[in-house]
A protein has these predicted regions:
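Rossmann-like dinucleotide-binding cores of NAD(P)H-dependent redox enzymes
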Residues: 58-59, 151-153, 159-216, 299-305, ...
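Short hydrophobic core segments
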Residues: 102-112, 237-246, 309, 385
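Glycine-rich dinucleotide-binding loop and its adjacent helix/turn
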Residues: 109-171, 207, 262, 268-270
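FAD-site-proximal beta/loop scaffold in flavoenzymes
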Residues: 126-148, 224, 234-311
Length: 449
């Protein structure tokens, strides 16, 4: 069996890894448009802040290491078309434009996504960067130490935007975050958490402007950015723009090959197969089942892409195992605060039209003086009493609690079961009642009124 895998990020790497494990005699062709395989964009912050010294170490694999396992690795190779009937692909060498054709028995698409570009005047000026991919990472690192770059504007306040803002603020730049939503990190946290994080960022000199977007980007005679004009009419001095306002799937060239939805996402079944037999798709260009609602949605997280990649590999010859539903569990730090969330929150439930209730509480991590506060919110279905989501934050690392909530969501656990679930106690680690127990007991009280 000959397996072709297009794309070398999380989903592509896991697919190749899975094929090597499940079909050791398979021939594997692995295609990457860039000159580097398996780069981890989620590790850019570590490189920008000096935690990781070598840009090339932010990866899962090397070309030599994969070739030693028998994988045929093709870098600088862009797949431009697919012929499902002939089971063939056309590949263009991006360096010389030479086109070749290659056959496959099974094809896995791990196409990923590209940063959303601002559709405004001035969008083609110099010094407008994205925080995605190895090439951008190298440019961003240079910008951190560029004496001509003093004012940095970050468009978007999701994880990528917050990481960019903190990294450049620590590098001594004056940073402004601009977001059209009313709060930062609105996809991940409710206002009880974002209010604290907003103040934290502002205390570190970062200016935050929400409920507004970019109207125009202004440049100078050298076509370099000099300022931004927002929809409120404010002009913001800017030497560097970092676009972090979302992503779009890199699937335009596939519209006549496989079925895409209205967002351009590749439609797959529960086994990752597309509308075309023998063609599978994984990663940020696809949807995955969201456990709290049972519906499919885009959740662009590395673990999801890897789960899909492993599932696709396992199901190549026979549909044997469905891709597991996920809760969108994720975590981040903002200066001294560390937070994690999973499942539904009040703000996301409202957008999705799902009826939920929530309880919020603060607690101490351990029974000791001068102890870090823990902020926790539990979201649940008021009708079935099932746990649907949670958020946690503290200056100490308590994020692992979210993994238990994610499992509770997958297993349809109720707040009644969570209220007295067994968690360990040791004074140096935790309290006799875990914060999850306390929140679930509070939820019981709210429901039983």
């Amino acid at each position: 069996m000959k397996v072709a895998v297009i794309g070398s990020s999380h989903g592509g790497f896991e697919t190749v890894r899975g094929v090597l494990h499940d079909f050791p005699n398979a021939e594997i062709d692995w295609y990457e448009k860039g000159d580097f395989v398996s780069f981890l964009s989620c590790g850019i912050e570590l490189y920008l802040q000096g935690v990781v010294k070598d840009v090339n170490s932010v990866s899962y694999a090397t070309i030599g290491g994969m070739e030693a396992k028998g994988v045929h690795v093709y870098i600088n190779s862009e797949v431009t078309s697919i012929d499902p009937e002939q089971h063939s692909i056309k590949v263009v060498d991006v360096n010389n434009g030479e086109e070749t054709e290659s056959k496959y028995d099974k094809l896995v698409l791990s196409l990923g996504a590209v940063p959303f570009e601002l559709p405004v005047p001035g969008k083609d000026l110099k010094n407008i960067y994205a925080m995605r991919g190895r090439d951008w990472e190298i440019l961003l690192k240079k910008a951190e130490v560029d004496p001509d770059i003093n004012n940095v504007s970050v468009i978007g306040s999701g994880y990528i935007g917050i990481e960019a803002a903190e990294s450049f603020a620590k590098a001594g730049k004056k940073v402004t975050i601009i977001d059209q939503n009313p709060t930062i990190l609105g996809t991940y946290l409710d206002s009880e958490f974002t209010d604290i994080l907003t103040k934290t960022l502002e205390d570190h000199g970062i200016s935050i402007k929400t409920s507004q977007s970019i109207k125009e980007i202004i440049g100078n005679d050298e076509d370099k950015v000099t300022s931004l004009v927002t929809t409120t009419g404010e002009t913001i001095p800017t030497d560097l723009v970092i676009e972090a306002a979302g992503i779009r799937p890199a699937t335009e060239w596939l519209k006549d090959t496989v079925k895409l939805d209205s967002q351009g996402l590749i439609m797959t079944d529960e086994y990752q197969e597309t509308s075309q037999p023998d063609i599978f798709a994984v990663g940020d260009a696809t949807k995955i089942e969201f456990a709290p609602t049972g519906t499919k949605k885009l959740i662009a997280l590395a673990p999801n892409a890897r789960r899909q990649g492993r599932s696709a590999a396992y199901n190549l010859n026979e549909k044997r195992r469905k891709t597991t539903a996920v809760s969108g569990s994720s975590a981040l730090h903002v200066y001294n605060y560390k937070f994690a969330s999973t499942g539904l929150k009040d703000v996301t439930a409202k957008k999705m039209g799902v009826d939920v209730e929530s309880v919020f509480l603060t607690d101490d991590k351990v029974p000791a003086s001068n102890n870090a506060k823990v902020y926790f919110e539990l979201t649940f279905d008021p009708r079935t009493r099932e746990v649907l989501g949670a958020q946690i934050m503290s200056k100490q690392d308590v994020t692992a609690n979210i993994n238990a909530i994610s499992l509770a969501i997958q297993k349809h656990m109720t707040v009644d079961e969570l209220a007295y679930a067994d968690f360990f106690f040791q004074p140096g680690f935790d309290r006799p009642w875990n914060v999850m127990n306390i929140a679930a007991q509070k939820a019981q009280g709210k429901l039983n009124k």
